């Protein structure tokens, strides 16, 4: 069972690792603070969850920031997760009360969009990686971002 406001890790007997993030209270707070309509709140909540999962791969008080530059009315979506406990996020502009559908989500977040992921560390210079997005949902767009991808700049001496 998933606990509210937690990040949980599971490891199968065959070595498959699964990370589950529940950021429902944080997403609800973002919606309340920024007066977001439902579709925008869903989008920001999903990106908050993805950001928190990506941040759990790090140690030593590292953090991660996502800048999701859309080509839509939303403008840019900003999310941060750090130290494994703290998340925050906001969007430049909310949608015009569009119905919550996967099609509308894809229209707002991924048509000619750009995803910038920045990893912050206390001991290293921040590292940013940029991905051009095509047409997909949030999980499909965050799929290319992985532990290996975010650590690609490190050399063997760093590890």
Task: Go through the PLM ranges and name each one.
Residues 51, 115, 131-133, 149:
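Hydrophobic transmembrane signal anchors and adjacent membrane-proximal interface regions, especially
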Residues 148-155:
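Conserved small/polar residues in nucleotide/adenosyl-binding loops
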Residues 137-143:
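Long, charged interaction segments in nuclear RNA/chromatin-associated proteins
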């Amino acid at each position: 069972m998933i606990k509210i406001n937690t990040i949980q890790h599971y490891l199968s007997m065959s070595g498959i690792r699964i990370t589950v993030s529940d950021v429902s209270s944080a997403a609800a707070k973002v919606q309340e603070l920024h007066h977001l309509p439902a579709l925008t709140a869903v989008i920001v909540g999903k990106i908050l969850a993805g950001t928190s999962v990506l941040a759990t791969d790090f140690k030593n008080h590292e953090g991660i920031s996502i800048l999701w530059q859309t080509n839509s009315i939303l403008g840019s979506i900003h999310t941060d997760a750090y130290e494994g406990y703290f998340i925050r996020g906001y969007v430049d502009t909310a949608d015009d009360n569009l119905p919550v559908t996967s099609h509308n989500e894809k229209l707002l977040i991924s048509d000619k969009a750009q995803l910038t992921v920045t990893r912050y560390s206390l001991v290293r210079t921040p590292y940013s990686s940029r991905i051009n997005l095509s047409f997909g949902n949030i999980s499909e767009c965050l799929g290319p971002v992985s532990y290996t991808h975010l650590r690609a700049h490190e050399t063997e001496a760093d590890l």
